[in-house]
Amino acid sequence: MNIQILLLLILFSTFASTKSDVSFTVETSLRTTLQEVNADSGLVMLMDSAGNVIGKSSLSLLNGKSLEDEVYTTVRDMGTLAVPVSLIPVLEKGNVSLSDTVDVGNGIYNHNGKEIRDHNADMGGYGEITLQQAILFDSKVGVIKSLSPYTTIKTTYSPTEILNFYHSIAVSDHSICSAKTMKEIQQTFEMVVSEGTGKPLFSDNVKIAGKTGSVIKE
């Protein structure tokens, strides 16, 4: 199985004093993570609050070399990491609410002839959950059943496009949605870390918000 790691970070402060410090830290962290999870390749992009990419690294453990710069702008399937891009317009129109419930059953669902599986399908799935919980626990079935009646869920973006989207959420850019929707999304991203699939990153010392994502390649 080909395993890839994609990590996009937005920092409002950093202890690294120089660009070289940031680059070294980013590459070292990526290499360590790839080895820990036995992944084939991965990339990291680090953006500051002003929207500047202050560090990035892409590595392949298959040959130990950095990937080409095009990897940051190449469109690919971003999986559930891209779900909020489709979610926001649907929330804005009032088609759905984060408190709406959806039955994901055993975590296996046939959508347009394709089998969709949640990461915990082998353990029986989540059953009935809210749309917000589908985001927190990275339930593909919950998201598709909730949103597909109202929109086409696009998941193909470049890492740079996705990073810019999450930066807009981090800095409360109301050009992409209303203040109400922005607050709901930000609170949900905080809960991903405090209660959901991002819980391993939770810290009592600093507030962290974000979204985990996954994609299965046949």
Can you name each region flagged by the protein language model?
Residues 3-13:
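Sec-dependent N-terminal signal peptides
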Residues 19-82, 93-95, 114:
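Short pre-catalytic segments that frame enzyme active sites
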Residues 30, 34, 51, 74-102, ...:
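Active-site SXXK
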Residues 39-41, 71, 77, 81-82, ...:
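Extracytoplasmic
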Residues 46, 100-107, 180, 184:
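Beta-strand segments within the central parallel beta-sheet cores of soluble alpha/beta enzyme folds
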Residues 48-62, 91-96, 107-108, 137-140, ...:
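Glycine-rich, acidic and aromatic/proline-enriched surface loops and short helix-turn segments
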Residues 96-150, 171:
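Conserved catalytic neighborhood of penicillin-recognizing serine enzymes
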Residues 133, 141, 145, 149-218:
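A penicillin-recognizing enzyme superfamily signal
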